[in-house]
Amino acid sequence: MTISVPATSANLGPGFDTLGLALELKNRFSIKPSSLSSIQIRGEGSKNPKLRVDNIFVRIFQETFAKLTEERTNFRFQFHNQIPISRGLGSSSAVIIGAISAAFMMAQKKATPEEILSLALAYESHPDNITPACVGGFTVATTRENSVFYIQKPLPDSIKAVVVIPHRPTSTSYSRQTLPKRYSMRDSVFNLSRSSLLTAAFFSERWDLLREASRDRFHQEIRMKQFPALFEVQHTALKEGALMSTLSGSGSSFFNLCLKEDAPSLAQKLQDRFPKFRVLELKFDNKGVVRDD
C-alpha cells in the first residue's frame, strides 16, 4: 500500500495558525506487512540515521494501527520524501496525516477527514498545516477540544506557487518562543481585517487583493529577523510579479503566489538573485492525502 501527502504552506501572512494551502510536492509512504520491521528512506532525510531509529511516522502508524485492530504486526516501511525538513513546508504534518491515514487503510477501516484531523491533534495542536495536508486546496481551520472545524476551497490552474527554500533550517518551537505574548488592539485589528480579506480573496479568486490582504503584524517580521536575507527575498518577489509573498509557516522557506504565466520568469529571477537557495515552481494540490497504489 502506498499513499502520498502534499507539502503545505501555512499562515499566509496574517492567518496565524489558521490559514494554509497544499502544494504539489509530496512525500510518499509505502507500507507492507513483513516478518521483520524495517525502514528505508529515499530523498529528504535519507542521510539522517535518527530517522531510522526513532521514526515519527512509524510510531504514529503503529499506535493508530494498534488502536484500530488491537494487533501488533511487523511492517516494512519505504519512504520517498520530497518535502524539505524544518523549512516551513509542513513535513511534520505530512508525516502525521500520512501515518494516521495509512493505519486506517491498512486496518481496512474508513475514516472521514474530520476523524483523521481529530486524531492528528494529539500530535499537532495547530490546524493550519494538517488540514490542507489532509484535504488539499486552500483551507481555513480552527479547533475546539478534539475537533477541527474547516472549510476548503480548490485552487485553480491559473495560479502557481514559487517557493524559495534556504538551506538553513528553522525550529518551529524556538520560533514561537520569540513571539510576543500580547498584541495591541491596533495590530490585532490590522491582522484580523487582512486575514478576513485574504480568505475572501481566495474564495472569490480576487488575486488583485492578495498583496494588501497578506500583510501581517503578528509574526513575520520577528521571524524574518532571524534570517535577514528573507526580507530581500520578499522584496524581490513582489517586485518581479508575485501577487503575494509570505513566510511559509515559521520559515525558513518563502511562499510566493503568482499567475501561471508569470511563474517561470519569477522563479528564474529569484534563482538568479539567490543562487544558493532552492527555488521550486509548483502547482497547487487539491486532493490532500491519497492512496497511490
Curated annotation (Swiss-Prot):
This molecule's function is given as: Catalyzes the ATP-dependent phosphorylation of L-homoserine to L-homoserine phosphate.
Look at the named UniProt entry and state the broad enzyme category this protein falls under.
Answer: transferase
Organism name: Wolinella succinogenes (strain ATCC 29543 / DSM 1740 / CCUG 13145 / JCM 31913 / LMG 7466 / NCTC 11488 / FDC 602W) (Vibrio succinogenes)
Q: What is the lineage of its organism?
A: Bacteria, Pseudomonadati, Campylobacterota, Epsilonproteobacteria, Campylobacterales
Could you tell me the keywords of this UniProt record? Amino-acid biosynthesis, ATP-binding, Cytoplasm, Kinase, Nucleotide-binding, Threonine biosynthesis, Transferase
The keyword tRNA-binding is assigned to this record: no
**What's an example of a GO molecular-function annotation for this chain?**
ATP binding
- The entry marks the following residues as binding ATP, namely P84, I85, S86, R87, G88, L89, G90, S91, S92, S93, A94
Q: In which pathway does it act?
A: Amino-acid biosynthesis; L-threonine biosynthesis; L-threonine from L-aspartate: step 4/5
Q: Which reaction does it catalyse?
A: L-homoserine + ATP = O-phospho-L-homoserine + ADP + H(+)
Protein's name according to its UniProt entry: Homoserine kinase
GO BP of this protein? threonine biosynthetic process
Gene Ontology CC, one term: cytoplasm
Q: What is its main location?
A: cytoplasm
Family membership noted in the UniProt record: Belongs to the GHMP kinase family. Homoserine kinase subfamily.
EC number, as in UniProt = 2.7.1.39
Query: Where, subcellularly, is it found?
Result: Cytoplasm
List the Pfam families.
Answer: GHMP_kinases_C, GHMP_kinases_N
